[in-house]
């Protein structure tokens, strides 16, 4: 049997992982500006953490979760999304305590798992970046979080992004709308897809964002949630809309957007861009004011979003956005002869300890092959070290781009290479 990676997974090799590191680092910098701190939760959780919060009738729970019983007969699941684990951690660690500053702002990054048909930008092990903000029911929190997502997408280079906005109202508004939707869809039940016929019984709002053609036709004239908002829900949505306009953020009200998870209320949103004629959601989220209490904590407002890293990178690639990744070596040492082996090791280590990205030859190759390696590594400078250089303690350092050279001592390289580096036209940070 040929051993290969499981279906729906990928090996992220160095050329690609550099892009991942850039995106993750970029997200960290943006989130830091908004006073978010990182939280890391387990990759697996108790089954109930996900099933009860995400919703027993959602596709995630009924079709897509990787769940199993461990050797202690505990029902475990690999996390399929990030919000429920973060809320569980928030409650379990009593981060709602009075001494903790509010609102509490967290971000997370890491792998998630869903058993679904693998396709471009959608794998069974995928990676998510997300944020969660606890303790503020102020509509300004909704807007700040949406704007932070827009800030990230714009600065990372995603083009043609449109903000789709909707509200699910408070529980009372949602219940009234749910019944209106049942009344509207029940006579059309036989025209719905099999999945939506089931959803009509269990969670009729999910029929609205079905991708099946027959379902799209059925909901064309469905009642709008906006007609069922009570005063509280309408006031919240109006405030969010007005603040977005005040900040110059364009949006589209999309009343068929409901999101795939059951815990949302009030504001929900998606950032969508078009790739090769298809609409792709690049980031999505919303408000979930009941989730902390559901996990046994006090009544606490919550708002957050998540985005898939694989899909983000796919969109950047399709849009021709080149990430500014710096892979070049600062120094490459070509080694000539056994007599230079020890000194080359000392020298490359001294350079690294000064903060330079440095490499040397270990394979006793001909100089031509070593110079080729220096070019492959895009080395900025090149040092050739042979036995004669070791004896004289003088070497030539070459700018590998302009071919300019300087003659310096080994001691100078070991102690103050930045002076040589700058002399050859490069700048140290």
UniProtKB/Swiss-Prot annotation:
Catalytic activity: tRNA(His) + L-histidine + ATP = L-histidyl-tRNA(His) + AMP + diphosphate + H(+)
Signal peptide extent: none
Gene of this entry: hisS
HAMAP family on file: His_tRNA_synth
SUPFAM superfamilies on file: Class II aaRS ABD-related, Class II aaRS and biotin synthetases
Keyword Cytoplasm: yes
Description of how the protein assembles with itself and partners: Homodimer.
GO biological process: histidyl-tRNA aminoacylation
Annotated compartments: Cytoplasm
Homology family: Belongs to the class-II aminoacyl-tRNA synthetase family.
Keywords: Aminoacyl-tRNA synthetase, ATP-binding, Cytoplasm, Ligase, Nucleotide-binding, Protein biosynthesis
Primary enzyme class: ligase
PROSITE patterns: AA_TRNA_LIGASE_II
Protein name, per record: Histidine--tRNA ligase
Main localization (coarse): cytoplasm
One matching Pfam family: HGTP_anticodon
Domain of life: Bacteria
EC number, UniProt record: 6.1.1.21
GO cellular component: cytoplasm
Lineage: Bacteria, Bacillati, Bacillota, Bacilli, Lactobacillales
A molecular function (GO) term: catalytic activity, acting on a protein
């Amino acid at each position: 049997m040929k051993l290969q990676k499981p279906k729906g997974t990928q090996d992220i090799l160095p050329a690609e992982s550099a892009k991942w590191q850039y995106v993750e680092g970029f997200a960290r910098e943006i989130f830091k500006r908004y006073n978010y701190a990182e939280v890391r939760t387990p990759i697996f959780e108790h089954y109930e953490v996900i099933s009860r919060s995400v919703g027993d009738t959602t596709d995630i729970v009924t079709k897509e979760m990787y769940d199993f019983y461990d050797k202690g007969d505990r029902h475990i699941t690999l996390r399929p999304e990030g919000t429920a684990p973060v809320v569980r951690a928030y409650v379990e660690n009593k981060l709602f305590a009075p001494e903790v500053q509010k609102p509490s702002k967290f971000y997370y990054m890491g792998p998630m798992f869903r058993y679904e048909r693998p396709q471009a930008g959608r794998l069974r092990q995928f990676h998510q970046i997300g944020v969660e903000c606890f303790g503020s029911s102020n509509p300004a929190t909704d807007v700040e979080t949406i704007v932070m997502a827009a800030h990230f997408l714009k600065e990372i280079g995603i083009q043609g992004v449109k903000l789709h906005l909707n509200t699910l109202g408070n529980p009372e508004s949602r219940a009234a709308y749910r019944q209106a939707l049942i009344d509207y869809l029940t006579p059309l039940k036989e025209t719905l897809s099999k999945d939506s016929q089931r959803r009509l019984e269990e969670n009729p709002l999910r029929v609205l964002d079905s991708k099946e053609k027959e379902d799209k036709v059925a909901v064309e004239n469905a009642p709008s949630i906006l007609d069922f908002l009570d005063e509280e829900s309408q006031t919240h949505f109006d405030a969010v809309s007005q603040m977005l306009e005040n900040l110059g953020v364009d949006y589209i009200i999309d009343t068929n957007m409901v999101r795939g998870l059951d815990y949302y209320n009030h504001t929900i949103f998606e950032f969508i861009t078009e790739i090769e004629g298809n609409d792709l959601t690049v980031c999505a989220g919303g408000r979930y004011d009941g989730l902390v209490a559901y996990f046994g904590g006090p009544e606490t407002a919550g708002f957050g979003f998540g985005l898939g890293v694989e899909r983000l990178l796919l969109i950047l690639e399709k849009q021709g956005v080149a990430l500014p990744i710096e892979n070049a070596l600062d120094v490459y040492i070509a080694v000539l002869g056994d007599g230079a082996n020890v000194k080359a090791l000392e020298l490359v280590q001294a350079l690294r300890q000064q903060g330079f990205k440095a490499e040397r030859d270990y394979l006793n190759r001909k100089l031509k092959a070593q110079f080729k390696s220096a070019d492959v590594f895009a080395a900025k400078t090149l040092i050739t070290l042979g036995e004669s250089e070791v004896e004289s303690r003088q070497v030539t350092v070459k700018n590998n781009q302009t071919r300019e050279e300087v003659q310096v001592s080994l001691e100078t390289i070991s102690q103050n290479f930045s002076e040589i580096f700058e002399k050859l036209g490069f700048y140290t940070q």
